[in-house]
């Protein structure tokens, strides 16, 4: 790898790290509900796709089932989701979002909209699409 490319990659890495910190700081400063992004992703998943088994949630979020247990425990204690037995297979637990969970999700969506607009609002639609494509290319 040539020296200029190496320098550019290091600068890119540092910029991505700075953006990560900015997103985390913005999330924390606006997070009046006290939930992580993963908690909100679970609520979003259940709201859009319906009840799920913990293993399906783990697969979608790309975390372990143990991680899902930790995340869902806080949401259950808060009354935002419920754990029920699957009617077809009594051995299988199923996670469902509650009415209160839907309300909290709406509040979170508003916070996320505000956060993303604050961070990316100065970009054009074309720049946002280009950035998205570049991130997807890096992930593959």
Question: Where are the regions a protein language model picked out?
Answer:
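Pre-recognition alpha-helix immediately N-terminal to the DNA-recognition helix
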Residues: 41-44, 103, 130
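Terminal interaction helix/tail motif
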Residues: 6, 11-12, 16, 107-140
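Basic, amphipathic "hinge/linker" alpha-helix immediately C-terminal to the N-terminal HTH DNA-binding motif
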Residues: 87-108
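Short helix-coil-helix linker/hinge
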Residues: 33-39, 98, 121-124
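Canonical helix-turn-helix DNA-binding module
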Residues: 50-93
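N-terminal leader segment of winged-helix/HTH proteins
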Residues: 1-33
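N-terminal helix-turn-helix DNA-binding core of bacterial DNA-binding proteins
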Residues: 25-64
């Amino acid at each position: 790898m040539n020296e200029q490319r190496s320098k550019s990659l290091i600068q890119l890495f540092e910029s991505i790290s700075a953006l990560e910190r900015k997103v985390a700081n913005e999330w924390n400063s606006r997070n009046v509900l006290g939930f992580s992004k993963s908690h909100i992703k679970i609520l979003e998943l259940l709201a859009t796709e319906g009840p799920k088994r913990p293993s399906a949630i783990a697969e979608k979020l790309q975390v372990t089932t143990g991680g899902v247990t930790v995340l869902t425990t806080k949401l259950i204690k808060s009354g935002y989701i419920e754990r029920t037995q699957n009617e077809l297979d009594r051995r299988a637990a199923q996670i469902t979002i509650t009415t209160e969970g839907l309300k909290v999700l709406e509040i979170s969506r508003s916070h996320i909209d505000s956060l993303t607009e604050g961070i990316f609002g100065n970009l054009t639609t074309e720049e946002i699409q280009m950035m998205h494509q570049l991130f997807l290319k890096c992930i593959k």
